[in-house]
């Protein structure tokens, strides 16, 4: 029998994994109560019969695949959304928490290297051949070209060459948009070019001077604030439309402080991310744990303290989580048109929340490695650009993912979160014996705790249900 879920309000629900729906019930099997009204008894008896007839109480084991079709991988490349280029691994800051710094052990050594235009051109030309092929079925596709580092502006010459090269490429139905992540130290030197070429900026800053204590400048005084203000004053329209902020949460700031600082000084709502928990060096775990602060806890703290800034962002964060929950468990969400024509039992899933290779982006490192994204450790290359040629074999990509999925797939089938997983297979740690483990696994004993939290939020704020169903669109 399925374990009932009792919300904090005292209502009882039953979740059916078989048809992926949640049913409100006064109490599981309550119709057998001898003191129940006869009409109520008949109602629940018929309802129970109907549910059993439709396998509501059957436990569903998801149909999971662990092998990608090679044609699927090639199709994703032909319909690519983002090409991310590490233009240099050199940086004019030395941030304590940097994913390429001393806290981590899953990245290549940083040698102040610069990306070569020829390598980028080889990859672009390879992709162009796919974008022009029959595999490209996108309609009016916008491809984001991202410049990553290090500090990308250190190698501005390369950025200009890439933009000039792509601007000369004419492919029907494809438009290029340029994005750059920067610490803003070199911003005044290149701001006119960035404005003229409509480059979108993501500026990294953690708040006030005290909040930025981990963002160590190697030489000279802190000029970031002045540079950002200069951009805002000289190009206000560009600043409004093309500039956003990213802040890293740690033990020297808080969500409240970050939001307050950036909203007050630049009238922007920042993206706030936690410290990267993937690939921490064994001898740095204690230091990492001291620096790490949970975004969820920081938001709760701000709300509890009555922050005037945080109510909106806390609500939005809550809505995002509720939307993901509803998409996963309410049984009425269809992510693609073909999903409308298949029963859930016919849909094949893959373990974890790992993206299909190249479905989101492709990342080229200074070392010539091709990765599925910048967050994946560089011990997992999917291909290379070296010696004047590209080596990207869809069969080898398929085998790598198969190797990663195999040890975890049986665990995923039994996990409560199999439809709502948030971890990438590349992030899964190994135990002392080298076996892959998942720290987020939830078994049947956790069903009440997990479901009741979200259900209670919807009980308490029924308006959110309507807002999420009719107003919120999260991709």
Where are these regions (language model features)?
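Conserved alpha-helical substructure of the radical SAM core
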Residues: 69-192, 197
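Flexible mid-to-C-terminal extensions adjoining Fe-S/redox cofactors in radical SAM and related proteins
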Residues: 6-11, 352, 369, 375-475
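Short loop/turn microsegments at loop-to-beta-strand junctions
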Residues: 10, 357-360
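Short, acidic, Ser/Thr-enriched surface-loop or helix-capping motifs
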Residues: 17, 364-365
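Conserved radical SAM core fold
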Residues: 104-105, 152-154, 184-188, 200-218, ...
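Radical SAM enzyme [4Fe-4S]-AdoMet core and its adjacent flexible, acidic
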Residues: 215-353, 357
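N-terminal [4Fe-4S]-dependent radical SAM core
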Residues: 2-24, 42-84, 102, 133-139
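Hydrophobic faces of well-ordered beta-strands that scaffold small-molecule active sites
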Residues: 83, 143-145, 178-180, 201-203, ...
